[in-house]
């Protein structure tokens, strides 16, 4: 029996930073979906959706320049789930010194977010023309130990996510951010690792549940 292949593209939150493969949201999603599905994790720690340069130097850590990005396209998946943007919502501020690294000041180039994200979408469409594509809205940034990551920057990207979705009516939204935000603040804080940026196993399970409900709304409703 041919399995439905789901390819998860993203950053460290997809990869499973700090928790290991079996606690990552793609792994937990595979458990929810069952044997008829194959879920492939192609997340890369620190990656940005934007692929930019400044004075000939690469800014951030562009996902499209990573080997796992090329592997994700080569998978020819039936479904692609893209969860990027957390690392684009940063200003490059040093954690100790009063200094901003311009090569990490991604939010200063936020007006280029849409075109760069669209390039990823177009590459997926070219690699897998019949695939369904889902865009995830990233989880909130809590009181992050790294000063450069701030929720207000993620909020600045929200209109751009809306613009991307409006320009691509065939793409569906998975609102991970809303899934966290609708909980009480204490409950939300309990879903993160100590760094305030990366969800812990419980938070990653919430992401998996949210993705599952988007992919399989009927089955999820029956389980509820």
Positions of the model-derived regions?
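N-terminal hydrophobic signal/anchor transmembrane helix of membrane proteins
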Residues: 69-88, 168-194, 204, 211
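Short acidic/His/Gly/Ser-rich catalytic and metal-binding motifs that mark active-site loops
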Residues: 48-51, 89-94, 143-145, 181-188
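Substrate-gating cap/lid alpha-helix
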Residues: 139-178
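Conserved SGNH/GDSL esterase-like catalytic core that processes O-acyl groups on lipids
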Residues: 3-7, 13-111, 115
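A short helix->loop->beta-strand "cap" motif at the edges of active sites that frequently abuts
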Residues: 128-132
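Generic structural signal for well-ordered alpha-helices
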Residues: 69, 117-122, 158, 162
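Histidine-centered active-site loop/cap adjacent to the catalytic His
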Residues: 29-32, 191-224
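Short hydrophobic segments within beta-strands
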Residues: 9-10, 136
């Amino acid at each position: 029996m041919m399995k439905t292949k789901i390819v998860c593209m993203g950053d460290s939150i997809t990869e499973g930073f700090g928790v290991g493969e079996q606690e990552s949201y793609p792994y937990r999603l595979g458990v929810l979906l069952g044997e008829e599905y194959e879920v492939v994790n192609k997340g890369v720690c620190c990656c940005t959706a934007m692929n930019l340069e400044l004075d000939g130097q690469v800014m951030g850590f562009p996902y499209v320049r990573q080997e796992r990005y090329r592997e994700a396209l080569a998978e020819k998946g039936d479904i692609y789930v893209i969860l990027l943007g957390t690392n684009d919502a940063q200003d490059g501020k040093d954690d100790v010194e009063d200094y901003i690294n311009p090569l990490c000041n991604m939010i200063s180039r936020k007006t280029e977010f849409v075109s760069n994200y669209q390039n990823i979408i177009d590459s997926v469409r070219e690699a897998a023309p019949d695939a369904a594509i889902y865009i995830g809205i990233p989880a909130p940034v809590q009181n992050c130990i790294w000063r450069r990551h701030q929720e207000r920057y993620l909020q600045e990207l929200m209109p751009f996510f809306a613009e991307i979705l409006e320009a691509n009516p065939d793409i569906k939204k998975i609102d991970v951010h809303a899934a966290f935000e609708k909980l009480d603040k204490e409950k939300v804080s309990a879903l993160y690792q100590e760094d305030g940026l990366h969800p812990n196993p419980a938070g990653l399970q919430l992401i998996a549940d949210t993705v599952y409900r988007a992919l399989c709304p009927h089955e999820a409703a029956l389980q509820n």
